[in-house]
From Swiss-Prot:
Record-linked InterPro entries: DisA/LigA_HHH, GIY-YIG_endonuc, GIY-YIG_endonuc_sf, GIY-YIG_UvrC_Cho, RuvA_2-like, UVR_dom, UVR_dom_sf, UvrABC_protein_C
Domain UVR residues, every copy: 197-232
Provenance organism: Listeria monocytogenes serotype 4b (strain CLIP80459)
Stretch forming the signal peptide: none
Origin: domain of life: Bacteria
CDD domains xref list: GIY-YIG_UvrC_Cho
Role summary: The UvrABC repair system catalyzes the recognition and processing of DNA lesions. UvrC both incises the 5' and 3' sides of the lesion. The N-terminal half is responsible for the 3' incision and the C-terminal half is responsible for the 5' incision.
Gene name tied to this protein: uvrC
Subunit text: Interacts with UvrB in an incision complex.
SUPFAM superfamilies, per database record: C-terminal UvrC-binding domain of UvrB, GIY-YIG endonuclease, RuvA domain 2-like
Name the record gives this protein: UvrABC system protein C
UniProt xrefs under Pfam families: GIY-YIG, HHH_2, UVR, UvrC_RNaseH, UvrC_RNaseH_dom
UniProt domain GIY-YIG: residue ranges: 15-92
Length: 603
């Protein structure tokens, strides 16, 4: 993916929390990160200066994607799962497999409330995971004060300090009814599932009372408890408090296109997603059902235990496709939120697609139209651009590139070895190339360009126009692209007499001309270098006394390349099996050639 395409994607990043996945040239995910605001965080990688390790990462990024979440906490939890899933090499690799903590009510005769990093199928009640260890412990401390479950891992022989603090019922000494535990467990579950708001309001009242009574230390403690509740109790739509495998579907449609996003929830966590975009031709709901049918035909898409679908989808039809899976159309709660989130990401992806298309249209077709307006000619939908390349007239070549509606048409590129011109004569070279190109266009009835661009000034433009008009009888607009002292596109010359076409340097039409000039220059230089690499060894040795075809082959076999021969001393050349006087002549000839060619590569 080009850097320009990345810049276009950066411009479309949403102002929302989420996770981003950086990819290298092979499409491998090399880094996963999270952001409170995706737009700001992802853009920061491609602007400003970075330390060495970040620079190494940025140098390998050629593409990225992102997943929008409902909160920053959710982004953090998703980031954990994505890193575990993809193991990106630029992410920190922990030595152990610790994850974020859960609050657990144990399944014991005398249950405990504990913090654990291990989630097991032991009939305990788990809540989380929580992204902030300190805050999770603070919430547990609040619960310990409100609900006096036992604290000891094994029952002691006598009551402990917690009993005297009112934080334990002391089952080690007293009988505690199971109904009492059930009552407390139900209240804890309610607290962790939203009932914390009542407790939070009570704490706020206590904090205000403590502040009014000048008990600032106590007020600060209440404040910390309130902050802990707010931090840890934020809803986490992407994590389910069970181990059920689910696929969550959401889709969006616009302008005849559909985007389907599938969230893969495994062991209760979102670990991956699938994004598909395609045109639909029938009813959207029907095409969506077709997609699901095809989706589960793939060997790597094993139907999970449950599938969540949006409203208005024929769940019975889906059930027929995956008969052993439970089909659910959620109506409320976290399950409904997950479907909404899949839809939200599908809508964002589809909007991004069309915005990228619009931006591409603006920089191609739109730029071509405005270029024609600025020049006072019909829209130049087909533009053919020419450039010459040689070194002191040796191996002169020319190249032509074609742009259709502002986009390169590489099948229409052409290369030319100059046949009739000796020495560095750009005007004569341009005449030959224009003659050869458009004589063939006439003969083979090929498409005529709407505009010819010449990489050069008045002399090259006049040479091209003279051949077109006076030799071939063609009336095609010809313009020239001039460069500044830094070899950058600076002006467009057109008209009779030639005038500078007024173009804003930050306009899309000017950028289009830059791309055309850079592309034809690249193409010409590449062709010239290829030609030189094939003929350079032979041509440089031509004319040296004592060096015939046999010794040329001997030198080539010994040194392997022209570069090594150019760097060789007389003694090293002699070691190739040639007489001393011949070695001296070869060294003298190559030294003179190097001096002549140094820093003189030109168009």
């Amino acid at each position: 993916m080009s850097s320009e395409h990345i810049q276009n994607k950066l411009a479309l990043l949403p102002d929302q929390p989420g996770c981003y996945l950086m990819k290298d040239r092979q499409g491998t995910i090399i880094y996963v990160g999270k952001a409170k605001i995706l737009k700001n965080r992802v853009r920061s990688y491609f602007s400003g200066t970075h330390d060495s390790k970040t620079q190494r990462l940025v140098q390998e990024i050629v593409d990225f994607e992102y997943i929008v979440t409902s909160s920053n906490v959710e982004a953090l939890l998703l980031e954990i799962n994505l890193i575990k899933k993809h193991d990106p090499r630029f992410n920190i690799r922990l030595k152990d497999d610790k994850t974020y903590p859960f609050i657990k009510i144990t399944n014991e005769r005398h249950p405990r409330l504990i913090i654990t990093r291990q989630v097991k199928k032991d009939k305990g009640k788990y809540f989380g995971p929580y992204p902030n260890v300190y805050a999770a412990n603070e919430v547990k401390r609040i619960l310990d004060r409100l609900y006096p479950l036992r604290k000891c891992s094994t029952l002691p022989n006598k009551v402990c300090l917690y009993y005297h603090l009112g934080q334990c019922l002391a089952p080690c000494v007293f009988d505690v009814e199971a109904s009492k535990y059930k009552e407390m467990q139900d209240e804890i579950v309610a607290f962790l599932n939203g009932g914390y708001k009542t407790v939070k309001n009570d704490l706020m009242k206590k904090m205000q009372e403590a502040a009014e009574n000048m008990e600032f230390e106590k007020a600060g403690e209440f404040r910390d408890q309130i902050n802990a509740i707010e931090t840890t109790m934020e809803k986490q739509k992407m994590t389910m408090n069970d181990f059920v495998d689910r696929d969550v579907f959401g889709y969006a449609i616009d302008k005849g296109w559909m985007c389907v996003q599938v969230f893969f929830i495994r062991q209760g966590k979102l670990i991956e997603r699938d994004v598909s975009q395609f045109p639909f031709y029938n009813d959207a709901d029907e095409d969506f059902l077709t997609f699901i049918g095809q989706f589960y035909q793939k060997a790597n898409h094993i139907p999970p235990k449950e599938i969540y679908l949006p409203d208005d989808v024929d769940s019975e039809a889906v059930q027929a496709v995956v008969p052993d899976t439970k089909i659910i159309v959620p109506q409320r709660g976290n399950k409904k939120d997950l479907v909404k989130l899949a839809y939200k990401n599908a809508k964002i992806a589809l909007n991004e697609k069309f915005m990228l298309l619009e931006r591409n249209e603006e920089r191609t077709v739109g730029a071509v139209e405005r270029l024609g307006e600025a020049m006072g000619i019909p829209t130049p939908s087909r533009v053919e651009a020419f450039d010459n390349s040689n070194i002191h007239g040796t191996d002169p070549v020319s190249a032509m590139v074609t742009f259709l509606d502002g986009k390169p048409s590489k099948n229409d590129y052409r290369k030319y070895k100059i046949k009739t011109v000796e020495g560095p004569d750009d005007y004569a070279t341009m005449r030959e190339v224009i003659r050869r190109r458009y004589w063939r266009v006439l003969k083979e009835e090929l498409p005529m360009p709407d505009l010819i661009l010449i990489d050069g000034g008045k002399g090259q433009i006049d040479s091209a126009k003279d051949v077109l008009t006076n030799e071939l009888g063609l009336d095609i607009p010809v313009a020239g692209l001039a460069k500044d002292d830094k070899h950058r596109t600076s002006q467009l010359l057109f008209g009779d007499p030639l005038e500078i076409v007024p173009l804003e340097r930050n306009s899309q039409e000017f950028y289009l001309l830059q791309r055309m000039q850079d592309e034809v220059h690249r193409f010409a230089i590449t062709f010239h270098r290829q030609l030189r690499s094939k003929t350079g060894f032979q041509s440089i040795l031509d004319g040296i006394p004592g060096v015939g075809p046999g010794r040329k082959k001997k030198l080539l076999k010994h040194f392997g390349s022209m570069k090594k021969l150019k760097e060789a001393s007389v003694e090293e050349i002699k070691e190739a099996g040639v007489p001393l006087n011949v070695a001296e002549e070869v060294h003298k000839h190559i030294t003179a050639f190097n001096e002549k060619a140094k820093n003189t590569e030109q168009k």
